[in-house]
Amino acid sequence: TPLGVAAAQTLMARLFPENPPRLVILREGLTAPAHLSGHMILLPAAALDQTDGPDVVAGYVLAEQLRAQADSATAKLLSYAGLIATVRLLASGSLSATAVEGYAETFLAQAPLPVSNDDLIAAFKAADVSASPYAFALDPTGQSVVALIEKDPFLGGSPRPVLDDGAWVSLQGICTD
């Protein structure tokens, strides 16, 4: 929906004011956050459906952006495709559909790489977002994410809203037609 797309853009501009990545919400096929080349963050629609507010979604996005900075999606694709396919890509400008389809299956089955708590806390602090809602979304007991909770730079809540209520509702409805 247009309002959902606008809300996604607002969220990304709020989290990354200087160079916001594009946020794409996928209704099917994705079970965990991911990133693609071209400065794109992917979230499963369930990440929006199973949370009470935008602070959790902000956490998923911040964590995935850290993964994107540490890990090139293009390099992974070319590594999967192999040397011959990579040389063909350089010579012809295209990659075989077989290589892309095979990598897509592998890509969708991968679990997200871990992100260091210190890097996450720094990202939350830079974005003015509380880390605790994200931490409790990962582990409702808080036991495995106690470091995120204890080091939360905004333990009482984000100092400014991640999204207003209208934008949050629009973002949640992004996949409805």
Language-model regions, residue ranges each:
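Peri-catalytic and regulatory segments of divalent metal-dependent proteins
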Residues: 1-75, 81, 174-176
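Soluble catalytic domains of enzymes that build or remodel membrane lipids, polysaccharides, and related
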Residues: 32, 55, 62-114
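Metalloprotease/metallohydrolase-associated module, dominated by Zn2+-dependent proteases
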Residues: 88-177
